[in-house]
């Protein structure tokens, strides 16, 4: 079983803070908890030792005693008057409520049977899917299949064969919890025979061996809502792992990956795209037909004098709000003014004529730039 040193059991240094001890304990107790390792005696023993270590190291007096005397501090009911003070009462039990709340979402202040039913709940599952941007725009139903534990159809989840009835657990005498004492340290935990139920099935189901669940393939349709974003998850209640002996099933979390689009880039509810336009259209203005994510085509007005990298806004042509309603984001079109190539002689003549008749007002940025450069060189040379 390895070292019995309390610090080694929890995987922390001797100078570890209480918060570090608690954090490490959470991981260890989750890993070795008997409910997650049914029938594993080694895990059960490890769980007991880890719990004992946690109880000692999170109590300042007990920890001081352990640091000074080691395990002998707790042998044979040694009290506070033997080598140290601390006012021990000779019998105490570990309080797991703050730890198990983190794992099982319930209060250990509830009855043993209530808390045990929560601990027998099936695990949540994760499934990843890919959808297109068009799917994310309109919403889509995606068929998926996966293998998990489902309720045993032979016993309907009861874990019993036929009309078998439950009887009082002989290990805990129906209490659902057992106490283990070592020295004056008393640890209370769920009964591993009945998993805290206080009852056991007399004749176990032959198909599921009394667990009330079997592994099988599940097929469902996942509804992906309109406006879903990359990385969002969809929760499907009760479609996770089936619980033990009729306990509540876990949930299925479907994580959505929205594939990159060839034309649009998405930022929140807004869409962005790049479009080349002719030099003449940029200079004179006009209209072009633009595709929208909803599959329609819409006219976009190009203002006179449009420059490369100008962004033109098309209101309400973006993605829908995932919260519902008719609100949509916008579409931003960034234009690139294309310079003509492979000109005919007539086109060259017309462009030369255009150049001859151009003035500073026709290309203000161009003229202003070179005027500025000339001014810089003049200042340097003077």
Swiss-Prot record:
GO terms for cellular component: cytoplasm. It is found in: Cytoplasm. Zn(2+) 1 binds at residues 152, 155, 205, 208. Residues 5-70 form the J domain. Its main location: cytoplasm. Zn(2+) 2 binds at residues 169, 172, 191, 194. Gene3D superfamilies: DnaJ domain, Heat shock protein DnaJ, cysteine-rich domain, Urease metallochaperone UreE, N-terminal domain. Disulfide bonds: none annotated. A zinc finger (CR-type) spans 139-217. GO terms for molecular function: ATP binding; heat shock protein binding; unfolded protein binding; zinc ion binding. Its cofactor is Zn(2+). PROSITE patterns: DNAJ_1, DNAJ_2, ZF_CR. One of its GO terms (biological process) is chaperone cofactor-dependent protein refolding. Binds 2 Zn(2+) ions per monomer. Keywords: Chaperone, Cytoplasm, DNA replication, Metal-binding, Repeat, Stress response, Zinc, Zinc-finger. CXXCXGXG motif repeats lie at residues 152-159, 169-176, 191-198, 205-212. It comes from the Bacteria. Participates actively in the response to hyperosmotic and heat shock by preventing the aggregation of stress-denatured proteins and by disaggregating proteins, also in an autonomous, DnaK-independent fashion. Unfolded proteins bind initially to DnaJ; upon interaction with the DnaJ-bound protein, DnaK hydrolyzes its bound ATP, resulting in the formation of a stable complex. GrpE releases ADP from DnaK; ATP binding to DnaK triggers the release of the substrate protein, thus completing the reaction cycle. Homodimer. The J domain is necessary and sufficient to stimulate DnaK ATPase activity. Zinc center 1 plays an important role in the autonomous, DnaK-independent chaperone activity of DnaJ. Zinc center 2 is essential for interaction with DnaK and for DnaJ activity. Belongs to the DnaJ family. This is Chaperone protein DnaJ. It comes from Anaplasma phagocytophilum (strain HZ).
């Amino acid at each position: 079983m390895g070292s019995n040193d309390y610090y080694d059991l929890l995987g922390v240094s001797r100078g570890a803070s209480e918060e570090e001890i608690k954090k490490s304990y959470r991981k260890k107790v989750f890993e070795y908890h008997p409910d997650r390792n049914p029938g594993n005696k080694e895990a059960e023993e490890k769980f007991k030792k880890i719990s004992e270590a946690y109880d000692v190291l999170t109590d300042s007096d007990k920890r001081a005693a352990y640091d000074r005397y080691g395990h002998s501090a707790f042998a044979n009911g040694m009290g506070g008057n033997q080598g140290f003070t601390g006012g021990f009462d000779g019998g105490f039990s570990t309080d797991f409520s703050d730890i198990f709340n983190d794992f099982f979402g319930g209060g250990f202040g509830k009855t043993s049977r209530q808390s045990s039913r929560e601990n027998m709940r099936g695990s949540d599952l994760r499934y990843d899917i890919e959808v297109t941007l068009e799917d994310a725009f309109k919403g889509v139903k995606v068929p998926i299949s996966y293998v998990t534990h489902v309720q045993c159809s032979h016993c309907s989840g009861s874990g019993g064969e036929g009309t078998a009835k439950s009887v009082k657990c002989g290990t805990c005498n129906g209490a659902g919890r057992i106490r283990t004492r070592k020295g004056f340290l008393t640890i209370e935990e769920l009964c591993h025979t009945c998993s805290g139920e206080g009852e056991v099935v007399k004749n176990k189901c032959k198909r599921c061996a009394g667990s009330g669940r079997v592994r099988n393939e599940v097929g469902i349709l996942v509804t992906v809502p309109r406006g879903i974003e990359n990385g969002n998850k969809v929760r499907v209640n009760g479609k996770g792992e089936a619980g033990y002996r009729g306990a509540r099933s876990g949930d299925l979390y479907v994580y959505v990956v929205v594939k990159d689009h060839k034309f649009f880039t998405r930022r929140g509810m807004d869409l962005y795209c790049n479009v080349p336009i002719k030099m003449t259209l940029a200079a004179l203005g006009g209209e072009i037909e633009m595709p929208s994510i909803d599959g329609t085509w819409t006219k976009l007005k190009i203002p006179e004098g449009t420059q490369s990298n100008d962004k033109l806004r098309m209101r309400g042509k973006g993605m829908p709000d995932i919260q519902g309603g008719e609100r949509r984001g916008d579409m931003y079109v960034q234009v690139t003014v294309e310079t003509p190539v492979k000109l005919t002689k007539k086109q060259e003549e017309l462009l030369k004529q255009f150049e001859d008749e151009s003035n500073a007002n026709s290309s203000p940025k161009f003229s202003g730039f070179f005027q500025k450069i000339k001014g810089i060189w003049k200042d340097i040379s003077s």
